[in-house]
């Protein structure tokens, strides 16, 4: 099978919905009857491709169509200042994308901010959701065990304000449990992605100044989610603590939790092979 590349799968769509008028970038991989939409996190320089490049081909090879959406304010998508709930904003954009692609129902796989977006979408358009996979995100709220904002979120916000290679390395050094995969090439690629869109960095900082609670607490509404849900967490997550994952499975009745030991905030990257097998089994049974 020909390797799937970012360039060959790169596409754009115009989303117009009320006050929204945004050019959104996405990658469209495979031609399966069922579609999995992957949603990235909020780190500077993030993108769907950067977040999930270790997870695309196994799903495509198993017969799924895989869509990687770059949320507004990241990668090649238009920038925006979010003064309200970014979770709801991203969900509206996702709704626009799946409407444009004429997809009646999708499975959603969301990491960190992507998990928040997946929950927001599921609460508003439950009839459009097949199954959910949430990793390192899905609801806000205060941890009873970890002072908030967490160590990782402090470094992330600091990197947005001062996008230097030194601050990037500080953040990414606690992003994962095992730092041996963090090469200088990876650091440089991420830095280049950040600095290529300084408007994204500035607008994220402006968004926090306008509304510090970009990702609201959905805890009181989790019981409304009926979709079968797989929650995946790293025991050593220093961005969003494990007890948040426990809150998700406590609130979503049709859910299960898998915890990776020796794993930080990026389970789909740190434990890719096991993660891919687990997600495929969940989606196909």
Curated annotation (Swiss-Prot):
One of its GO terms (molecular function) is 2-hydroxy-6-oxonona-2,4,7-trienedioate hydrolase activity. Transmembrane segments: none annotated. It comes from the Bacteria. Keywords: Aromatic hydrocarbons catabolism, Hydrolase, Plasmid. The active site is at 265 (proton acceptor). The keyword Electron transport does not apply. Its EC number is 3.7.1.14. GO terms for biological process: 3-phenylpropionate catabolic process. The record marks 190 as: Catalytic role in ketonization of the dienol substrate (substrate destabilization). GO terms for cellular component: cytoplasm. The record marks 112 as: Transition state stabilizer. It is an enzyme of class 3 (hydrolase). Pfam families: Abhydrolase_1. Pathway: Aromatic compound metabolism; 3-phenylpropanoate degradation. It catalyses: (2Z,4E)-2-hydroxy-6-oxonona-2,4-dienedioate + H2O = (2Z)-2-hydroxypenta-2,4-dienoate + succinate + H(+); (2Z,4E,7E)-2-hydroxy-6-oxonona-2,4,7-trienedioate + H2O = (2Z)-2-hydroxypenta-2,4-dienoate + fumarate + H(+). Catalyzes the cleavage of the C5-C6 bond of 2-hydroxy-6-oxononadienedioate and 2-hydroxy-6-oxononatrienedioate, a dienol ring fission product of the bacterial meta-cleavage pathway for degradation of phenylpropionic acid. Belongs to the AB hydrolase superfamily. MhpC family. Homodimer. This is 2-hydroxy-6-oxononadienedioate/2-hydroxy-6-oxononatrienedioate hydrolase 1.
């Amino acid at each position: 099978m020909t390797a799937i590349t970012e360039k060959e799968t790169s596409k754009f769509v115009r989303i117009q919905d009320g006050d929204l008028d945004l050019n959104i970038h996405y990658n469209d991989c495979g031609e399966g009857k069922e579609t999995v939409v992957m949603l990235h996190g909020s780190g500077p320089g993030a993108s769907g491709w950067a977040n999930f490049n270790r997870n695309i081909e196994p799903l495509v090879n198993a017969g799924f169509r895989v869509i990687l959406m770059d949320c507004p304010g990241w990668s090649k998508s238009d920038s925006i200042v979010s003064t309200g709930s970014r979770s709801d904003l991203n969900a509206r954009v996702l709704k626009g994308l799946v409407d444009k692609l004429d997809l009646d129902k999708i499975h959603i796989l969301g990491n960190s901010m992507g998990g928040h977006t997946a929950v927001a979408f599921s609460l508003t358009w439950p009839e459009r959701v097949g199954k959910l996979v949430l990793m390192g995100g899905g609801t806000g709220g205060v941890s009873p065990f970890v002072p908030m904002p967490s160590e990782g979120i402090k470094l992330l916000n600091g990197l947005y304000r001062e996008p230097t290679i030194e601050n990037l390395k500080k953040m990414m050094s606690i992003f994962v449990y095992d730092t041996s995969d963090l090469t200088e090439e990876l650091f440089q690629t991420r830095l280049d992605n950040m600095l290529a869109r300084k408007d994204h960095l500035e607008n994220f900082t402006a968004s926090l100044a306008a509304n510090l609670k970009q990702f609201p607490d959905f805890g009181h509404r989790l019981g409304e989610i009926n979709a079968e849900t797989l929650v995946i967490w790293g025991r050593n997550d220093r961005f969003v603590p494990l007890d948040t994952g426990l809150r998700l499975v406590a609130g979503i009745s049709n859910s299960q939790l898998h915890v990776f030991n020796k794993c930080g905030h990026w389970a789909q990257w740190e434990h890719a092979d096991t993660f891919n097998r687990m997600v495929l089994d969940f989606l196909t049974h």
